[in-house]
UniProtKB/Swiss-Prot annotation:
Chief subcellular location: other
Name of protein: Altered inheritance of mitochondria protein 44
Keyword annotations of the record: Phosphoprotein
Ranges annotated as biased composition (Polar residues): 338-348, 355-368, 400-414
GO cellular component term, pick one: cellular bud neck
Subcellular location: Bud neck
Keyword Protein transport in annotation: no
Annotated stretches, region: Disordered: 55-77, 314-414, 636-709
Lineage: Eukaryota, Fungi, Dikarya, Ascomycota, Saccharomycotina
Length: 758
């Protein structure tokens, strides 16, 4: 279709300035270098038009073809009066404003005044030589003087104007006559006045053919004496509309030069619209007619090609009225019950018109409406078959949909066509979210029955109201129950009363019922482990901590643990009692002996005595102690030889040390051993204190004897220390002995490594 539309839109509404763009004008060029003959090329059309029609008069003021683009100013500041050879559709705003009057004085700006505005727009003035008086001449004289490709001269308005009153014979479809805006001023004047007031088109009255010809003759006689410079037209042509394009076509085809004596009404449109030949109205009306015809043709084609499953009447003897009634009934039934004609062959185009999506049948969506449909006999999770055939018996859908109440959501009107982007933005609620809404919820648009079949839900075979609402990806959004909505400017506006109409849904379902099988406290293992793990935080005395602090901490912790573990079995208590009694007796004796040794070595008196003993090797007691500790550490702690001559350290003690150290290493891995060891911390506090006192008395005397009897050959084998820290119990593979040193040297904490070599 050829329908003109505005190209530039950023303009002010009432004769305002262009906001972004200006066409090239005379104001931007040096004055007098270029005239409008060089700025436009419609003079070619003037010559061709004059040659074909043999026009005798100067017709520059007659048509928009000749005089529209050679108006007062080339500036585009007032977009209604010049376009410099371009179309200007910029100001199609209000067609009811009264046309302005132009007051023109020589060597002054052309002033445009309007009755409905206090503004006055000024056009660029054209300087003329002072001695030249302006004139008019017939087009025959001009043709002899000018070249065939030169422009017909156009005159400035300083007096009366000669205009011819005939229509523009550019085509058969022109519907405009050009009426003179200076019709009231076409009176013979003997005095050549320098100014002329042009009345508006509302003031200009239509005049008959005879009166206008008389006026033209008097004007030509008055202006014949004047010399002939180049002229410009400062007049804006007025356009008068003929009745309609139908009559104008017939009239112009009959005779080109015939004038219609019918009454002419002023065309109400803004002066910004300038179309060559005045064909804008014709093309707009033509476009409207073509649109109407195409719409009718489209409806006819859609009825022929995509008939809405009109079933043929079986008997051929029926009348036309019965056929029409049957067609209407069939259409209504089709929209109500069956969306697909089971008997007709379906093409992808027909499927698309009948609400198919990617060759999948629409009936899939009826099966996916779980709350609406009755529970089916087959309890299988619903799956979409991509090889679903169109032809299947009609009884299945009738059985499914006969006894079930219709949901208000399911509407069988043809769905709106949506683009891919609008489908992504569609405010759709999947049926999985509908099953999650409780039945008594006011916001739910589908009432959920209590006896919903558990296996027919879309997303999972388990039906639970507590699961998080997430959905599987569907084959197509049109196969899913959607909210009623309207698509306005490619945006979906929901029509439901839900407060939260759009629910964000992800790809899969998280069933929270599986998370509730375990209690929140005992979420990893059995309850016994939790009780044991709480008990496993038994306090182990650091090697350099005092015994008083250890005893206080153990008494406080053991009192709490006794209350918790009062109900344990008696057999395990007895076994753990015996084990811990043996374990604590050996460990406490070792730690006390180590402290005594270090205290004696650090003492100056004992160092002097011992240095005399070890004078052969020229090494201090500290070097010997370090050597023995390193050898003991590298020997994997299998044997400790600190107490060689002591009767307390027997073979049983060595085995018990190894076993007990392994027990401490594997406390969190082996729960039973941890319980036994921790329980006996409580029961043996009194025995520990007694044994420590006895051990101190015995070991101090024996240690002094051993230190006195040490020889250089026995140093590395006698002094060896093996200690296991409670921090080494996490992983037995990496649990190495930590040697206790004075607090100024090493401060042990949880952040230090498990094993240290000195």
């Amino acid at each position: 279709m050829i329908i003109r539309a505005p190209i530039r839109t950023k303009t002010k509404s009432f004769r305002g300035d262009q906001m972004d763009f200006k066409f090239p004008s005379n104001e931007s060029l040096p004055r007098g270098t270029l005239e409008e003959y060089h700025l436009n090329n419609h003079h070619l059309l003037n010559d061709v038009f004059a040659a074909e029609n043999g026009v005798s008069r100067d017709e520059d003021g007659n048509s928009q073809i000749l005089s529209d683009y050679t108006s007062t100013s080339n500036t585009n500041t007032n977009s209604g009066y010049s376009s410099n050879g371009y179309y200007s559709f910029a100001n199609i705003s209000d067609n009811t404003t009264s046309s302005p009057r132009i007051v023109i004085n020589q060597n002054e700006t052309a002033r445009l005044t309007s009755s409905d505005s206090n503004k006055s727009d000024f056009f660029a003035s054209h300087d003329f030589p002072g001695n030249d008086s302006l004139h008019y001449s017939s087009s025959s004289v001009v043709k002899n003087q000018l070249h065939s490709m030169e422009a017909i001269p156009e005159g400035n308005i300083t007096g009366s104007i000669s205009t011819a009153f005939q229509t523009i014979p550019t085509a058969d479809n022109v519907s405009y006559d050009i009426a003179p805006s200076s019709a009231s001023s076409l009176l013979p004047r003997k005095s050549t006045s320098k100014s002329a007031i042009l009345p508006s088109t509302q003031e200009a009255k239509p005049m008959t053919k005879l009166n206008m010809e008389k006026d033209i003759k008097t004007i030509e006689l008055n202006n014949s004496v004047v010399p002939k410079p180049k002229k410009k037209l400062n007049r804006v042509p007025t356009i008068r509309r003929v009745e309609s394009s139908r009559f104008s076509n017939s009239r112009y085809s009959s005779s080109v030069s015939s004038k219609s004596s019918s009454s002419r009404c002023s065309l109400k449109r803004s002066k910004a619209i300038r179309c060559k030949g005045g064909l804008l109205y014709y093309f707009t009306s033509l476009g409207i007619k073509i649109k109407k015809k195409l719409r009718k043709l489209r409806l006819v084609l859609r009825r022929r090609l995509f008939s809405y499953n009109v079933q043929k009447v079986p008997s051929a003897t029926n009348s036309k009225t019965t056929k029409s009634k049957a067609n209407i009934n069939n259409k209504s039934k089709k929209r109500g019950t069956n969306l697909v004609n089971k008997n007709s062959n379906s093409t992808p185009r027909q499927k698309k018109s009948q609400r198919y999506v990617s060759n999948l049948q629409r009936s899939i969506s009826s099966k996916s409406l779980v709350p609406v449909l009755a529970p089916q006999k087959k309890t299988k999770p619903l799956t979409v078959d991509t090889k679903f055939k169109a032809n299947h018996p009609q009884s299945e859908d009738s059985k499914v949909g006969s006894n079930t109440p219709r949901s208000p959501l399911v509407s069988y009107t043809p769905s709106l066509r949506r683009t891919n982007s609008s489908i992504r933005r569609a405010a759709s609620i999947l049926t999985a979210s509908a099953t999650m809404t409780p039945a008594n919820n006011k916001n739910s648009f589908i009432s959920v029955p209590d006896n919903v079949s558990h296996a027919v839900t879309r997303n999972s075979s388990m039906y639970s109201r507590s699961r998080l609402v997430r959905s599987k990806p569907s084959t197509a959004l049109n196969a899913i129950a959607r909210q009623p909505s309207i698509v306005v400017e490619n945006k979906v506006i929901p029509l439901s009363m839900n407060r939260y109409s759009i629910k964000e849904e992800d790809e899969y379902v998280i069933d929270t019922s599986s998370m509730r099988e375990l209690s929140p406290v005992n979420s990893v293992c059995s309850s016994d482990y939790d009780r044991e793990s709480s008990e496993s935080y038994s306090n182990y005395a650091d090697a350099m901590e005092t015994t008083e602090v250890d005893n206080k901490d153990r008494v406080e912790c053991n009192n709490e643990i006794q209350n918790v573990n009062a109900n344990n079995e008696e057999t395990s208590n007895e076994e753990s009692y015996n084990l811990m009694k043996h374990y604590l007796s050996t460990v406490i004796a070792q730690r006390i002996m180590l402290r005594v040794q270090i205290a004696r070595i650090q003492n100056n008196k004992s160092n002097v005595v011992y240095m005399n003993k070890s004078a052969e090797t020229n090494s201090t007691i500290y070097e010997d102690l370090a050597d023995t500790l390193l050898t003991e550490y590298e020997a994997d702690g299998s044997s400790s030889q600190i107490f060689d001559g002591v009767s307390v350290r027997a073979d049983e003690e060595e085995e018990e040390d190894e076993d007990d150290e392994d027990d401490e290493e594997e406390e969190e891995e082996n729960d039973d051993e941890e319980d036994e060891e921790d329980e006996e911390d409580e029961e043996d506090d009194e025995e520990e204190e007694e044994k420590r006192k006895e051990g101190e008395g015995r070991n101090l005397a024996k240690e002094v004897d051993e230190l006195a009897e040490l020889s250089p050959m026995r140093k590395q084998s006698d002094l060896s220390i093996t200690l296991r820290s409670p921090f080494a119990m996490l992983n037995s593979a990496y649990s190495n002995s930590i040697i206790s040193l004075p607090t100024g040297v090493v401060k042990r904490s949880l952040t230090l490594p498990v094993g240290m070599k000195i």
